[in-house]
């Protein structure tokens, strides 16, 4: 490929020959191009080297300076602006493809604005070269200039520095000092002497069109400059505002400019993409496309009645039920008082909740759950849900104000462990947090409690005021109500420690006392343990047990919600331990289910994703009368099974199938099957599940890579063993088969099975023959494999 210099060496002689040709009467650039069309062929292969504008400029230059030598012309047109343009090109080419595409889009948008609107340069200092033939120095001397005030308006001054410069021998000067021009930054401001207005250049700016107003003797001369000008401010006359000249993607002035530029577009719809893809312009899209508002003319004769032909089934009525989101049902189970209360809450949050600006939203339906908002539950500050046992709580508010409480409370916990033979030290931070929460709650409602428990106050109750020296054991013994404060704060600390313990510790301690204990009266048991501890630490004497019992009854009435949860947890644990202690015979797994679970009468085939439009289901859907003719068809006769059918069925069932069993979203291992129950290992813990419970609620989830498994085990709560468990098991499988049939073969008969046999293979082969009466079973399974898996997982693995 030829370079730019070689192309110019070919062009210059042709232009000179054309201009000197006397046979041509009317000489012009267009006529020259007509006679030298081959120049465009050359230009086609050298697009980046020389353009049509370059040829035109070269023609005008030669026409005005016919005697200039060829080498000088080639030198000037080969290198003027070359260095700067090369730097710009290299800088742009180094950008990543994605950034370059974004940059091109951004440039085109700004180029549209600057090319259509007249953005006037607002530069405080502008240098202008003024012709001075008496000046023999061809260098640009910034020191020798005269200053003139170009204009002053809108509190803005523009100072023009007129620099004398001899332009008579400009071309010869440029050709001789080409190297100096290429490496001198002061010529860069004047585009290497291509213009006489000097404004700084920046590669960070775009090559867009600007207007420079040059004022001479009250005459304003607008000069158009298109270059990478480093202009800080531009002025737009239509808005009478000055704008900072930055080329951000999200320019806040786009909206103002857009309202000005829309009337100037000849075909506004061509710019729809610009307006829709920009945040600042998208609001102007309707104004851009100029959609006229629909107007309605009033009728001359207004209609008094509108007659509507109603369908008959409209009279029957209809009902629309709101299907609750899955999280509304799950949160009820998660908030039930149980041994795994906090674990259930945290699992619920991990599965259904995402936080945005401290607000809790369901990731299925998008509804805000206010009780789980960070500001509502104070999860971050108090860890009401995410309980941490081994992390200091005094790094956050409000606990950092009570960091001095650690010494008193931690000493009490160590004393409790030593005296009562417990292990509460590992939960010291949680105990400290619960104590502070309780005291903060009492402090906020102290005046209300003083009126409510006036009788109890006379007997020793003292509602503490939260202060800086509350836990200071060195506080003056002369302080009012000193003994009452000491007794109440020691009791609260001991009470919270006991509530953080487990039922095994409480029952072990009460058993060692060798006294008859009524475990249904938990308040009395707590009073006994707290009294024994306070008596051994010499906080109370042996005659104050009734006082401690009064304290227990009173403080449990005003306990925080979390302490009440611990209280109920201990009651459940004690009931469970007592039940286990009584039941030393062979366990009956059929009656050991203590959780009541509602059983649905019918399973609906819902889609795998939930959207707001699908949360409404209309029932009692009736087909409009006279819409189509219903043809009554006779039932299809079910084929009788042959030896060949049995072989095909056995080949299908012989496929190696590995089944994954999951319990509560956790993989189960080492499954052992017995006549009445199943033994599984989940996270290194062995669990026992009675077989009859599988028909009550869906505990076990089955996963397989073989679609045949999902077809013939569809709706089967226990898809193992050669024999079914009971007649109820048979009914479950028949119901599941009909669900599958209704979804994938809606025009088929209802599947029935009248045998009393519990043989699994007979029932599954009967369903195979039922399917074979309508379709080729193998091909049908392959075609509907995705739908079958989806139906199985939605209905039985959710």
From Swiss-Prot:
<feature type="region of interest" description="Interaction with NPH-I; required for transcription termination">
    <location>
        <begin position="1"/>
        <end position="195"/>
    </location>
</feature>
<dbReference type="GO" id="GO:0044423">
    <property type="term" value="C:virion component"/>
</dbReference>
<dbReference type="InterPro" id="IPR004974">
    <property type="entry name" value="Pox_Rap94"/>
</dbReference>
<comment type="subunit">
    <text>Part of the early transcription complex composed of ETF, RAP94, and the DNA-directed RNA polymerase. Interacts (via N-terminus) with NPH-I. Interacts with J3. Interacts with ETF heterodimer.</text>
</comment>
<keyword id="KW-0805">Transcription regulation</keyword>
<protein>
    <recommendedName>
        <fullName>RNA polymerase-associated transcription-specificity factor RAP94</fullName>
    </recommendedName>
</protein>
<comment type="similarity">
    <text>Belongs to the poxviridae protein RAP94 family.</text>
</comment>
<keyword id="KW-0946">Virion</keyword>
<dbReference type="GO" id="GO:0006353">
    <property type="term" value="P:DNA-templated transcription termination"/>
</dbReference>
<feature type="region of interest" description="Interaction with J3">
    <location>
        <begin position="234"/>
        <end position="254"/>
    </location>
</feature>
<keyword id="KW-0804">Transcription</keyword>
<keyword id="KW-0806">Transcription termination</keyword>
<keyword id="KW-0426">Late protein</keyword>
<dbReference type="GO" id="GO:0003700">
    <property type="term" value="F:DNA-binding transcription factor activity"/>
</dbReference>
<comment type="function">
    <text>DNA-directed RNA polymerase-associated factor required for the transcription of viral early genes as well as for transcription termination. Within minutes after virus entry, recruits the core RNA polymerase, the early transcription factor (ETF) and other enzymes needed for transcription initiation, elongation, and termination thereby allowing synthesis of early mRNAs which are extruded through pores in the core particle. Recruits the multifunctional J3 protein, with poly(A) polymerase-stimulatory, cap nucleoside-2'-O-methyltransferase, and transcription elongation activities.</text>
</comment>
<dbReference type="Pfam" id="PF03294">
    <property type="entry name" value="Pox_Rap94"/>
</dbReference>
